[in-house]
């Protein structure tokens, strides 16, 4: 990413260029990204190709002012942070599902970010409702955040009996890490750094498999200025207050749905997105 691209990205999220890669600047960038770049899976249902290459991600997030899912959002954010002087590594995660079962390999992409003081942080702007600020990767106690109470712990065996190790060459002694929110496991991270291209298979699976929740539903969601959340799921708009109270409404017309995409998320689809049926082309 060149300086002009970085400046355009910073304008996209309404942030000033930090003078140094500090944790304070990282917190501000993380929060502004969550407020301005929506977590959304519209490309899957609009028949748009998802390509995990830096230039393509920048074109989508910055040039076309869209959002994306974890691979796109954290991939693009990681490129920005690198351009701003942070040391960034891509980490592969597996999301916890029903009965504590872990998802597929490369199920999730998150970032390990090293700040100027040498501290390592977990930055994740691509997991929907999650921490508003980066989490310390060195801290094993509770970390209080507007998004909940989080813990980062060394992983034990999963329900299948697989131990939480990432293999030779991994950081943190080779141990996988579990990320918990309000006492419940969210995802498991390998600590071995990966390349963006490594996540191509995971992105393809989530974009095509009938078992992926991304192919079965529509979502467009962002953090609000007051710390709540605004989510458009198909035609249902849910407003979540900072205290967790929810209000829902369903627009009556296509024009109202398109206006919500435009006014609340900055997205201008030509038609109202609908869940793409299996085998449907174009």
Language-model-derived ranges and their functions:
Residues 1-13, 17, 38, 95-242, ...:
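His-Asp-centered catalytic microenvironments across diverse enzyme cores
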Residues 235-282:
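Extended, charged low-complexity segments
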Residues 23, 94, 275:
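Residue-level "edge-of-site" marker
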């Amino acid at each position: 990413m060149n300086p002009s691209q970085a400046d355009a990205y910073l304008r996209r999220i309404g942030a000033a260029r930090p003078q140094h890669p500090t944790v304070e600047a990282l917190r501000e960038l993380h929060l502004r990204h969550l407020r301005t770049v929506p977590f959304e899976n519209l490309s899957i249902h609009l028949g748009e190709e998802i390509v995990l290459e830096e230039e393509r991600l920048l074109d989508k997030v910055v040039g076309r002012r869209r959002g994306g899912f974890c691979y796109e959002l954290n991939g693009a954010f990681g490129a920005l942070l690198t351009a701003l002087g942070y040391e960034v590594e891509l980490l592969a995660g597996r999301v916890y599902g029903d009965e504590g079962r872990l998802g597929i390999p490369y199920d999730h992409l998150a970032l390990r970010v090293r700040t100027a003081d040498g501290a390592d942080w977990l930055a994740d702007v691509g997991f929907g409702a999650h921490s508003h600020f980066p989490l310390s990767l060195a801290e094993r106690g509770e970390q209080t955040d507007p998004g909940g109470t989080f813990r980062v712990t060394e992983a034990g065996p999963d329900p299948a009996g697989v131990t939480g190790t990432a293999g030779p060459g991994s950081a943190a002694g080779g141990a996988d890490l579990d990320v918990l929110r309000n006492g419940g496991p969210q995802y498991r991270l390998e600590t071995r750094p990966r390349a963006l291209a490594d996540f191509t298979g995971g992105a393809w699976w989530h974009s095509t498999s009938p078992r992926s929740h991304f192919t079965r539903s529509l979502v467009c969601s962002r953090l609000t200025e007051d710390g709540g959340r605004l989510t458009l799921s198909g035609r249902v708009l849910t407003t979540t207050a900072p205290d967790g109270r929810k209000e829902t409404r369903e627009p009556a017309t296509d024009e109202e749905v398109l206006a919500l995409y435009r006014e609340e998320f900055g997205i201008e689809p030509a038609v109202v997105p609908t869940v793409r049926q299996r085998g449907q082309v174009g």
